[in-house]
Amino acid sequence: MNKLRMVCLSFLVLLLMVSCNHAEEYEEPVLPQPRGQVERTVLAYIVGDCGNSFSELSDLFRVNFQDMLKGMRHVDYSKCNLIVYSEMDNDVPRLISIKKIGERVVADTVFTYEEQNPLDKRVMSSVISQTVHYFPAKSYGFVFLSHSASWLPASQKPNVRSLGMYRKTQMDITDFHDALLSFPEPLKFILFDSCLMQAVEVAYELRDCADFLIGSPTEIPGPGAPYDKVVPAFFVEKDCASRIASAYFEEYNYWYTGSISGRGPWRSGVSIAAVKSSVLHLLADKTSIVYAQAIGELGRLQKEGIQRYDWSDDDANYDLNGFVSSLLGEGDELYREWKTVFDDAVVYWNTTPQNYSGLIRRLFSMDKAHGLSVYIPEGAYNSPMNSFYRTLQWSKAVGLDRIIWK
């Protein structure tokens, strides 16, 4: 009987041990440990799952991602982090750390997520907060890759304007602003690797989110930023924004021929500007004086002769300098005062002689371009575009309600 009891007891102990081992086998995965603080963390936010009609965007972004890996070869990894939030078609959303192990650059998936809309400001805020927690730094940068088109309100229509495109949904610039406040301090820079984002309305709306904003006033080249050249500039301290913009421009300028690109390098040009946020309130103040003095009724505003950046039906982006000079004349003293402030705000600007528009499928001249766009109001007071425009901080700061829609 005692022997039987011993056998039963031994069996129970063995069963308990096996159960414990199985419990350990199915425990929740161990969360990664936060990395120690570095000089700078840059979060590249890729929104490539735009729906079946735009699946080629994910293919372009996968090339961009590989170029980011190449760019990290030339970076001191002990002082920086390059983190990528990737939302591509035929893949789960994931947060990736591009790191160096010895001389090798590797992509380490830190987190994967259930399906979520990356253009929901709560999702974007959560990704930012997670990045800040696990990859703390003394300063931060943000890169946005997707479709976009300036400040216009979000819409459910495919290929309509605003910021980003996820399965034919978009994000308002005001929601984008709120999400970026999840960073613990203003960003060192925001790079918009997406179309038509170097607009004064966008820059002014985000002026408390970043020291510098980098982007194009018109459509960007299909391949996007040359990240093997641009990534090293993310982590420099002096003239960071200008060096990012210059690296972006110079690669395309090298290949520029003024012809429509086929296979091989993009030869159809590029334009890129960097804007200093701390000067934008002065630009708004001076622009409000110009508008108050020079603008009469809404119907008198003219677009003829001013550089056009936006070739869609919205027709929402024209050259800011060209608009102001058309109101005052370049010989006017007020214009010269305004232009001094404008030049202080636009710290870098460069363009090839022509750029390409995929909307009209041809090259167009950039000879009257100065790098920063503006909306020239037209149409009914209560049109969707004008109603949304009046909610933007730039519209309020320059007094359009008092001057035009009075």
Where are these regions (language model features)?
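Terminal, contiguous helix-loop blocks that mediate binding/assembly
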Residues: 28-30, 133, 157-406
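Bacterial Sec-dependent N-terminal signal peptides
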Residues: 16-39, 376-378
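Sec-dependent bacterial lipoprotein signal peptides
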Residues: 1-19
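Short alpha-helical segments and helix-capping/turn motifs at coil-helix boundaries
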Residues: 26-29, 53-73, 121-133, 199-200, ...
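Glycan-recognition patch characteristic of GH18 chitinases/ENGases
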Residues: 45, 56-122
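Loop/turn elements at helix/coil->beta-strand transitions in domains of secreted/extracellular proteins
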Residues: 38-41, 76-82, 136-141, 184-189, ...
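Cell-envelope and extracellular/periplasmic
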Residues: 34-62, 66, 87-91, 114-115, ...
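Catalytic-core segments of thiol-dependent peptidases
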Residues: 87-108, 116-183, 194-195, 200, ...
